Amino acid sequence: MAEMTVQIVTPDGLKYDHHAKFILVKTPNGELGVLANHENLIAPLEVHEMKIKRIDDDSHVDWVAVNGGIIEIKDNLVTIVADSAERERDIDLSRAERAKKRAEKAIEEAKEQHRIDEVQRAQVALRRALNRINVGSK
């Protein structure tokens, strides 16, 4: 079966490097499924749960919380460059829950003070926290 290499890179370094037969990512235009031999592509990514089906076993799926970034597909190498990314096994759920509560509180306070920029920043923080919670709970 054809395969591709999937690498996820953040400012902290290489977070993921494995062979896969399928990945699913989310772009601003919707979900994008990628198989081996996909045509070359560069696209922006949303905050999302990335699904990676590994080649070793049909039931072996890795989940990664990706916080935006870009995807490049070229010659069966899929590279994700993101601000941050965490595998399900590396997510501290209690920390993610605390981040969610902080973001919810920040949204309420910013709304009361009519600070639109702060509301938007807190909403992004909330999306990231919820993404980490969803992936960490898998």
Curated annotation (Swiss-Prot):
Keyword Ion transport on entry: yes
Cited Pfam families: ATP-synt_DE, ATP-synt_DE_N
Superkingdom: Bacteria
GO molecular-function terms, A-Z: ATP binding; proton-transporting ATP synthase activity, rotational mechanism
Keyword set includes Membrane: yes
Entry's localization field: Cell membrane
CDD domains: F1-ATPase_delta
Disulfide bonds, paired cysteine numbers: none
A GO cellular component annotation in the UniProt record: plasma membrane
Lipid bilayer topology: Peripheral membrane protein
Keywords: ATP synthesis, Cell membrane, CF(1), Hydrogen ion transport, Ion transport, Membrane, Transport
General function of this protein: Produces ATP from ADP in the presence of a proton gradient across the membrane.
UniProt record similarity statement: Belongs to the ATPase epsilon chain family.
Subunit note: F-type ATPases have 2 components, CF(1) - the catalytic core - and CF(0) - the membrane proton channel. CF(1) has five subunits: alpha(3), beta(3), gamma(1), delta(1), epsilon(1). CF(0) has three main subunits: a, b and c.
Protein name, per record: ATP synthase epsilon chain
